[in-house]
Amino acid sequence: MSSSSGSAVNIAIVTLFPEMFAAITESGISRRAVEQGLVKLSFFNPRTYTTDKHQTVDDRPYGGGPGMVMRVEPLAKALLAAKQWHSEQRAEQALPNTAKETVIYMSPQGAQLNNQAVDTMAASGDFTIIAGRYEGVDQRFIDAFVDQEWSIGDYVLSGGELPAMVLIDALIRKLPGALGDAQSAEQDSFENGLLDCPHYTRPEELADAWQTSVDDRRVPAVLLSGDHKKIELWRLKQSLGRTWERRPDLLNKLDLDQSQRNLLTEYQQQKLSCSSSDD
């Protein structure tokens, strides 16, 4: 990503609803990344590039059917403006203008976004993200201009803005300096192919009023031990166990070493023992 050379990562967003992105420009880690100059965001509304008084960006689908389809011309003009913005940013940052930003369309028909894909994107440069609306975008625009299509899951949303924000937030977390602790990203779920381990904070024991069992009220003793090696092994075991219970498909993709297999076996045996004692 551009930030590795000390320059900002540039992300242009083509959207009919730029105001929705206040969720990432005004809050949390993404806001700080913008303020620190780690990432630059710019928004391009296709309505700005229409020529009729109604600012029409959609029309009925050929062949009939429900809904409306976003037209090529306003999208293409918005994308052209985004390309010009990218060129200006590269000039300001003294980057070679031979570089080409990746054009991404957020779509239920796209490949499913995962951590590996975000890692690959994070190493590839700048982006323009297309957030569609209505029944979708004229396929001719996709064929002519889009480099990649990505989905955030097997369900349909009202538009591409929320998926675009998901992608931007995931990318920002990969930027050096975006997180307060560099280890935060390294310990996220999926960074090592596993789900994250459980986390606890004060107090050490919850009050009886929470009506949980005694064991559930207390922080696991190993986390209070100060033994960093034991804590590391406990966290790895919990990650392995959680992944086995909740996402066994992820485990099938990993080549666990012997120590990891031993930890997983321990977890499984402990779970079996607890289940037997409950019967």
From Swiss-Prot:
Q: What class of enzyme is it?
A: transferase
Main site of residence? cytoplasm
Q: Which reaction does it catalyse?
A: guanosine(37) in tRNA + S-adenosyl-L-methionine = N(1)-methylguanosine(37) in tRNA + S-adenosyl-L-homocysteine + H(+)
For molecular function, the Gene Ontology terms on record are:
tRNA (guanine(37)-N1)-methyltransferase activity
Q: Where in the cell is it found?
A: Cytoplasm
Keyword Methyltransferase assigned: yes
An annotated GO cellular component of this protein is: cytosol
EC number annotated for this UniProt entry: 2.1.1.228
- InterPro entries associated with the record: Alpha/beta_knot_MTases, tRNA_m1G_MeTrfase_C_sf, tRNA_m1G_MeTrfase_TrmD, tRNA_m1G_MTases_N, tRNA_MeTrfase_TRMD/TRM10
Q: Binding positions for S-adenosyl-L-methionine?
A: G132, I152, G153, D154, Y155, V156, L157
**Biological processes annotated in GO:** tRNA N1-guanine methylation
Per UniProt, the keywords (alphabetical) are:
Cytoplasm, Methyltransferase, S-adenosyl-L-methionine, Transferase, tRNA processing
Which PANTHER family does the record associate with it?
TRNA (GUANINE-N(1)-)-METHYLTRANSFERASE (PTHR46417:SF1)
Oligomeric state and interaction partners are given as: Homodimer.
Q: Which family does it belong to?
A: Belongs to the RNA methyltransferase TrmD family.
Give the HAMAP family listed for this entry: TrmD
Say what the protein does.
Specifically methylates guanosine-37 in various tRNAs.
The name this protein goes by in its record: tRNA (guanine-N(1)-)-methyltransferase
From the broadest rank down, the organism's phylogenetic lineage runs: Bacteria, Pseudomonadati, Pseudomonadota, Gammaproteobacteria, Cellvibrionales
Q: Which gene encodes it?
A: trmD
